[in-house]
Structure formats: C-alpha cells, structure tokens
C-alpha cells in the first residue's frame, strides 16, 4: 500500500512538472485544457431552447461545366461556416493572452450542413476539410468556430432550353441540416457587397457568364417532423455566350440553306435561239434534286452535333431545334417545288401548247417577278404573227378571185341572154374600184380609174375594160389554181420548239415566284428566329438585375 501511494505521488509530480515546463507551446496547453471534457459527437449546446446559429457564406470561384443532356451544374466554390461552440471557450489571460487557435476539423463537433440537390453523396469527394479556427469569446462563453473549405458542387439543375443557344439559366443550391431541426441548428446567410455569393475571385468562363446571385431563407415543415427545418436557397443566374453556336452551327446552316434556295430556283441562260432550244431546265434543273438531297444530308450532320447538347425532353422545343426544323422544311419543300418546275418544263416536250389562261396569268405575273419575255420567244411570236397575217392576206386574195370568177360567169350568161344595146355595168365598175383595186397585181391596177359607164355590148367589150384577168379566169383550170389555199406553215421541229419555249417561259416565271417565296420564308425563319433569341438574351442580360 505504501508503494502504491508513493507511485501516485510520483506521477502527480511528473505531471505538474510537465505542465510547468516552459518548453511546451501555449497552444498545447490550451488545446489540452479546452478538449479535456469535450465530446465531439454531441451537439455543443448548453442552454435549452437556444439553437446553434450557423452562418454560411459562399464565394464562387469557377464554373467548370454545364451539362445540358444530364441536367447538372459543376462549379468550384469556397465555403465558410461560422457558429458559436459553447463548450469551447477560455480566458486569454490564463494562456498568455492567446485568443485564437487552429484545430483539426475532426477534433470538434461540426454541423451536418448538406447540399440537398447534390449529385455527389460522398462529402469527401466534394469537400476538402482541413482545420478550423477557434476564437474565444471568454471563459464559459464559448468560442467562435470558422470552418473554411474549398468544394466542388455537382448540383442538379433543371435547365430551360427553350431559347437555346440564347438561354439564361437559374441554378439553385439548397443548404440545410439533414438531421437537426431549427430548434437545434438554425442557418443564416452572409452576404457580400456584390451579392449573396462573392464573385471577387471568380474566373471568367468562355461559354457562360454570371449575371447575378440571390439567396432566400426558408423555414420548411416536413410531414415527418413536427418542427421546421431551415433551408438556404442560393440562386446562381448564368447566361450562355452564343458566339460559338452562331458561328459554327447557325451561320453555316443559314448559308447552306440560302445557297440551296438560289440553286433550286435560278437558271442560267434558259433560252436560246429559235428552233434550237437548249434550256438549262433540260441540263441544270436535273441536278437540283441532287442538290436538295445533299443539303439535307449536311443538315442531318449539324443536327447530330446539336442533339448532343440537348436533353431528351419534350417539355419545350429549343429555339435552335425550331431553326433547324424550319431550314429542313424549306429545303424539302424547295426540292419538291424544283421538281414541279421540271414537270412544267417537261410538258413542252409533249408538244401541247399551254392553255390561254395559263399564258394570261404568266403574262400578268411576269412583270411583278421581273421576268421579261425572252427575245427568242418574241421573235418566234413575231414570225408566227407575220405568217398569220400573210395567210389572212392570201385568204382575202382567194376570196377576191372567187368574186371575179362568179362575175365572169355571170358576164358570160349575160352576153348569151341580153340583146344588143346599152347596158350599165355598175356592179363591174364597183367591184373594180373596191376589191380588185386592192389586189397586188400591176395589171389590175390599170383598171382602177374606171367609173360607172354605159357601153354597147359588142365583141370588143372585154378589151375596153382592160381586165385581162377576166379572160384568164374563163378557164376552169386557172380558176382552180387561184382558189387553191396558200398557207405558210412552220416545220414540225420549229413548231414543237415554239411550244417548248412557251413552257420554258412558264417554268421560268414559276421558278422566279418560288425563288421570291422561299427567300421570304428563309428570311423570316432564319433572321426572325435568331433576332428573337438575341432580343431575349439582351433583355435578360440588361434588365434581370
């Protein structure tokens, strides 16, 4: 028994000597003192009904990734949590006026601050916890604990891609205690001069810009628990920089579509000389179907590039998807329209001329679409009109010779039946002055000065009239040769090519109408959609905050 008592005295003296050893740092003595009766697994709460107030502050350092298909935001931030630990406190005068001390994070109690919408369940993968800073508030008053740590938050964010790539997204981070209600732990945000989330050390992102931040404190009651839980909602408003998509996707697609429209409905020298038609409708319009199919294939590649950026959602149609849909529709319908132009042109090879109503509407529309009738077609019309005029003139001549024939026949009968005497030849003289005088015969022109007269009916009557044609028509063979119709007709090859010219002109006018129509549709679709998206992007950028 005496030996045991001696050993205890020795141990106490040794401990006292170590405590008074001036070589031991004051932090060691302070740590041993405050941790002597500390239980890090229990909440450091002394007074009942008074929760531990945790102040949370965030500083955004970098936006790492915005993943549209998987709907999450990956960012790097610096977090600071502050609270008063009532079990950690000391009198600075007892420890050489030491007011601060650094301790390991796993030596003290930490609040279970949880990011509710985190996609990473392991805190060690998102937080880098090292040390905590303890600042005493006085003996039996506790100490202010500051936990500073860098973190990478992978948060779920419901992205609204309606105006993609001119979109603005708001991603929310919800913080709170997972185990303690607000009767034990209560949360409060700490704001900065430039907003609830600090941006002083933020690194600019090439694809996104931060428009602003917001914070909202909410006390929410769950059905499982009778007491409310405190939640802090941090909203980060980011806006996409659309330059990449405009230059690499939208602009090339618009250029390809516009060039395709021009290629569909623009002909090169569609008319050549008469009776030797070689329209580009024959040669070039056949390639327009291939052009349309090739353009659609190139569009499918670009759509594949865009689809990688899109989530599989049916809630809305992104603006860029609407843009590509309209471009594909324009090219598809344009290909069908080009086929209809080819069909109209091919009607000329059948040989049937266009209907008069078709030509009438073509003549009306042509000036509005700035299509003039080709010179070769005007020459063909002029030549056909000249031949028609010549045919009518020859028809009138044949009609006059028929009158001469009947007059000569009546004259012969008159000579046989009428006795000698004076006879008036008013009809003969009138016919000479009105009809025969218009005939293109020099010999007939000699008798145009005759007037109504009376002459004896003798054998010299025909000679006194100076109308040898009356003697010529006395022969039936001569009369039949005069009455034979004389028509000047075009060769079948030339006649067919006149029809082809007409159908080519109808096709050219229809082609120009399609060109104007599809150009207007392209301008409204391409420029209109992108201007609308840019307007939304600009207004949110300047008027959101």
From Swiss-Prot:
Glycans are attached at residues 53, 97, 228, 276. One of its GO terms (biological process) is chemical synaptic transmission. It is a multi-pass membrane protein. Expressed in the body wall muscles that are arranged into four longitudinal bundles, some mechanosensory neurons, the head muscles and multiple interneurons. Not expressed in motor neurons (at protein level). Changing residue 321 to T: In cb103; highly resistant to monepantel. The chain crosses the membrane at residues 245-265, 287-307, 317-337, 513-533. It comes from Caenorhabditis elegans. PANTHER family: NEUROTRANSMITTER GATED ION CHANNEL. Betaine receptor that functions as a ligand-gated non-selective monovalent cation channel in mechanosensory neurons to maintain basal levels of locomotion. The channel is permeable to Na(+) and K(+) but not to Ba(2+) or Ca(2+) ions. Elicits current in response to betaine, very weak current in response to choline, virtually no current in response to acetylcholine and nicotine, and no current in response to glycine and GABA. Disruption phenotype: Mutant worms are morphologically similar to the wild-type but exhibit mild swimming defects and are lethargic with their movement being interrupted by frequent pauses when crawling on a food-free environment. On the same environment, in other occasions they display decreased rates of spontaneous reversal and steering, and slightly increased average speed. Homozygotes are fully resistant to monepantel but heterozygotes are partially affected by the drug with reduced fertility and slightly impaired movement. One of its GO terms (molecular function) is excitatory extracellular ligand-gated monoatomic ion channel activity. Residues 20-244 are extracellular. The keyword Transmembrane applies. Belongs to the ligand-gated ion channel (TC 1.A.9) family. Acetylcholine receptor (TC 1.A.9.1) subfamily. This is Betaine receptor acr-23. PROSITE patterns: NEUROTR_ION_CHANNEL. Pfam families: Neur_chan_LBD (PF02931), Neur_chan_memb (PF02932). Residues 1-19 form the signal peptide. Residues 338-512 are cytoplasmic. Its main location: membrane. It is found in: Cell membrane. The keyword Lipid biosynthesis does not apply. Changing residue 301 to N: Increases sensitivity to betaine. Leads to death during larval development in most cases, with escapees reaching to adulthood but being hypercontracted and uncoordinated. Disulfide bonds join 157-171, 224-225. Keywords: Cell membrane, Disulfide bond, Glycoprotein, Ion channel, Ion transport, Ligand-gated ion channel, Membrane, Receptor, Signal, Transmembrane, Transmembrane helix, Transport.
């Amino acid at each position: 028994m005496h030996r045991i008592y001696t050993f205890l005295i020795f141990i106490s003296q040794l401990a006292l000597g170590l405590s008074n050893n001036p070589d031991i740092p004051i932090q060691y003595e302070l740590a041993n003192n405050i941790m002597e009766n500390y239980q890090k697994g229990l909440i450091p709460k002394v007074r009942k009904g008074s929760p531990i107030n945790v102040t949370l502050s965030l500083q955004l350092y970098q936006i790492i990734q915005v993943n549209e298909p998987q709907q999450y935001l990956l960012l790097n931030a610096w977090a600071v949590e502050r609270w008063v630990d009532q079990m950690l406190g000391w009198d600075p005068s007892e420890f050489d006026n030491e007011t601060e001390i650094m301790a390991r994070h796993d030596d003290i109690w930490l609040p279970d601050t949880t990011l509710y919408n985190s996609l990473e369940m392991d805190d060690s993968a998102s937080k880098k916890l090292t040390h905590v800073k303890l600042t005493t508030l006085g003996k039996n008053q506790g100490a202010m604990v500051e936990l500073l740590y860098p973190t990478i938050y992978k948060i779920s964010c419901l992205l609204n891609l309606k105006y993609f790539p001119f979109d603005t997204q708001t991603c929310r981070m919800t913080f709170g205690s997972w185990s303690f209600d607000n009767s034990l732990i209560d949360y409060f945000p700490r704001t900065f001069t430039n907003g609830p989330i600090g941006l002083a050390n933020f690194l600019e992102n090439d694809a996104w810009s931060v428009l602003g931040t917001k914070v909202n404190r909410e006390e929410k009651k769950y059905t499982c628990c009778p007491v409310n839980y405190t939640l802090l909602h941090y909203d980060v408003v980011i806006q996409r920089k659309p330059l990449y998509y405009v230059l690499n996707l939208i602009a090339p697609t618009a250029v390809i579509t516009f060039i395709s429209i021009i290629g569909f409905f623009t002909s090169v020298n569609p008319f050549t000389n008469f009776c030797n038609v070689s329209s580009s409708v024959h040669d070039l319009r056949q390639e327009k179907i291939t052009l349309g199919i090739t353009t659609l294939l190139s569009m499918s590649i670009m759509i594949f590039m865009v689809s990688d950026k899109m989530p599989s959602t049916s809630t809305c149609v992104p603006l860029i998807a609407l843009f590509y849909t309209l471009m594909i529709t324009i090219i598809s319908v344009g290909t069908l329209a080009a086929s209809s132009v080819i069909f109209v042109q091919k009607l000329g090879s059948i040989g049937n001329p266009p209907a008069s109503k078709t030509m009438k509407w073509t003549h009306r529309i042509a000036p509005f679409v700035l299509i003039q009738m080709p010179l070769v077609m005007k020459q063909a019309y002029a030549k056909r009109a000249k031949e028609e005029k010549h045919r009518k003139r020859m028809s009138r001549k044949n009609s006059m010779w028929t009158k001469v024939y009947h007059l000569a026949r009546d004259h012969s009968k008159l000579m046989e039946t009428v006795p000698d005497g004076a006879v008036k030849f008013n009809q003969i003289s009138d016919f000479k002055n009105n009809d025969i005088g218009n005939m293109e015969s020099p010999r007939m022109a000699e008798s145009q000065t005759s007037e109504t007269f009376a002459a004896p009916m003798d054998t010299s009557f025909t000679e006194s009239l100076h109308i040898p044609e009356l003697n010529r028509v006395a022969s039936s063979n001569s009369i039949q040769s005069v009455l034979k119709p004389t028509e000047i007709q075009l060769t079948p090859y030339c006649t067919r090519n006149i029809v082809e010219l007409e159908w080519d002109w109808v096709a050219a006018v229809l082609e120009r109408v399609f060109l104007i129509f599809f150009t207007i549709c392209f301008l409204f679709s391409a420029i209109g959609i992108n201007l609308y998206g840019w307007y939304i992007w600009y207004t949110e950028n300047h008027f959101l905050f």
